[in-house]
Swiss-Prot record:
Residues 199-230 are annotated as: Disordered. Residues 214-228 have a biased composition (Polar residues). GO terms for molecular function: FAD binding; UDP-N-acetylmuramate dehydrogenase activity. The keyword Cell division applies. The active site is at residues 167, 216, 298. InterPro entries: FAD-bd_PCMH, FAD-bd_PCMH-like_sf, FAD-bd_PCMH_sub1, FAD-bd_PCMH_sub2, MurB, MurB_C, MurB_C_sf, Oxid_FAD_bind_N. It is found in: Cytoplasm. It comes from Ruegeria pomeroyi (strain ATCC 700808 / DSM 15171 / DSS-3). The gene is murB. Its cofactor is FAD. Transmembrane segments: none annotated. This is UDP-N-acetylenolpyruvoylglucosamine reductase. GO terms for cellular component: cytosol. It holds the Pfam family MurB_C.
Length: 308
């Protein structure tokens, strides 16, 4: 058991995670903790036995939780972690602040973080995964992050400590990112909002935004962002090699590779995590067999299968 006497947040045992992920699949976590604020999170992690695993979870936009669930304490940040403050060209956002909200508030203040507007998820996830699109990455604008380490200690990490790479960073194991400071370049608010609207229009025309998906399924083999630069003509894209392998529209159970954009894995209704991950693995095998390219997952998969 976990001692709850000193915490103010909500601790829920055996919490089903399927309703917390965009794909609406997954089994239960041993525990779900929703801290009230940073002090509460620090208190909880200090008293949590060291042998209990911690999994920080954002809004579940880039995540498959396997059907057997997660043997860990899942930490999900809420309202106490979604403030957005702008000072000059620097935007400091709580880890639970949505990327789209940060982009809009920055634009209101004449700060260009427009690439965040079409990225699903929260700032915590954007930093952890070095999220990006249209040739811009979180690492390009990142200045520092506040994290609560697994020990409960509050620390400030810079870009050197996080060692950003394509869709990766070195956030310490068990650490929970609580806020990040990003520095954009000045811009005209009206022009920034117009650019974001154009990006949204393009996304809606090319991606299955009305389906249950988790964004891009696989990293691009070239290491570029999944949508590429607006003027990028590089041929080696994940969607292209998936198409060449004949896997656009492929199905397994309730899972499907989108007909609209073949690098989007969607839950058409009633899919299990096993369906989704299984179809993804079929795609990886077929792409390797036809092109010799090994696709790497961009969607994070965690937890245990139902039978194990």
């Amino acid at each position: 058991m976990i001692d709850t006497s000193a915490i103010r947040g909500k601790l829920t045992p055996n919490r089903d995670l399927s309703e917390l992920t965009w794909l609406r699949v997954g089994g239960p976590a041993d525990w779900l903790f929703q801290p009230a604020d940073i002090d509460d999170l620090q208190t909880f992690l200090r008293m949590l036995p060291a042998d209990i695993a911690v999994f920080p979870m954002g809004v579940g936009s880039n995540l498959i939780v396997r059907d057997g669930g997660l043997r860990a304490v899942v930490i999900r940040l809420g309202r106490g972690f979604n403030a957005i403050d702008v000072a000059g060209d620097t935007v400091t956002a709580g880890a639970a602040a949505l990327d789209a909200h940060v982009a809009r508030k920055a634009a209101d203040a004449g700060v260009d973080l427009t690439f965040l507007r079409t990225i699903p998820g929260s700032i915590g996830g954007a930093v952890r995964m070095n999220a990006g699109c249209y040739g811009s990455y979180t690492a390009d604008v990142f200045r520092s992050a506040q994290v609560v380490l697994r020990s409960g200690e509050l620390a400030t990490l810079g870009a050197a400590e996080l060692n950003f790479r394509y869709r990766q960073s070195d956030l310490p194991e068990g650490a929970v990112l609580v806020s990040a400071s990003l520095q954009g370049v000045p811009g005209d608010p009206e022009a920034l909002h117009a650019r974001m609207q154009a990006q949204l229009d393009k996304r809606d025309q090319t991606q299955p935004t009305k389906e249950r998906s988790a964004g891009s399924t696989f990293r691009n083999p070239a290491g570029f962002s999944s949508t590429g630069r607006a003027d990028d003509t590089h041929e080696l894209k994940a969607w292209k090699v998936i198409d060449e392998a004949g896997m656009r529209g492929a199905r397994l159970g309730g899972a499907q590779m989108s007909e609209m954009h073949s690098n989007f894995l969607i839950n058409t209704g009633g899919a299990t995590a096993a369906d989704l991950e299984g179809l993804g693995e079929e795609v990886r095998k077929k792409v390797y067999d036809t092109s010799g390219i090994t696709l790497e997952w961009e969607i994070m998969r965690v937890g245990d299968p139902l039978d194990g």
